[in-house]
Curated annotation (Swiss-Prot):
Protein name: Guanylate kinase
EC number: 2.7.4.8
Protein role: Essential for recycling GMP and indirectly, cGMP.
InterPro entries, A to Z: GK/Ca_channel_bsu, Guanylate_kin-like_dom, Guanylate_kinase, Guanylate_kinase_CS, P-loop_NTPase
Domain Guanylate kinase-like residues, every copy: 4-183
Swiss-Prot/TrEMBL catalytic activity: GMP + ATP = GDP + ADP
Key word Zinc-finger present: no
Amino acid sequence: MPDRNIVVLTAPSGAGKTTIAHRVLEAMPDMQFSVSATTRAARPDETDGVDYHFLSPEEFRARIDAGDLLEYEEVYPDQFYGTLRSEVEDRAEDGPVLLDIDVKGALNVKRIFGDDALILFVAPPSLDELQRRLEGRGTEDRESLQDRLDRVEQEMDRADDCDAVVVNDDLDPAVEETLTRIRQFLSS
């Protein structure tokens, strides 16, 4: 696998990492997106194999047992997220790869790939703004929204373990900062 071509965006849910990831992919056509696997139900606008690889909990556990996952986490009972090793390794042969994963997974990727991976933490401008964004999605019931908010503090505490922090208080400058950091990393 070529050196220095793995880029990871990580953030608490609602910080804007997926939006930034889409903008990065638009601006850098040679960058490939690593599609994560999950056991959660697909949202109405999501496509299997494009947004996520949607697996049953049994299928996901079989992939864990087979060593097919680079990283994974059981976020809630029977709700797994993870990165298929083949997604990263196969795509990295053809050029830089972008991952959009949670903080724990991002730090595991860094542990495995070291300086060949750039980990960028996308931070919300404030916790109040993050809560507003999550509520605005309308995809969560009160209990799951509160669960997500409870995790935010733990995730924010890990920001300094990442290579850099990009504060997403205004999307366009956050995208530009992200692109600058990625281009510097890929050219070094």
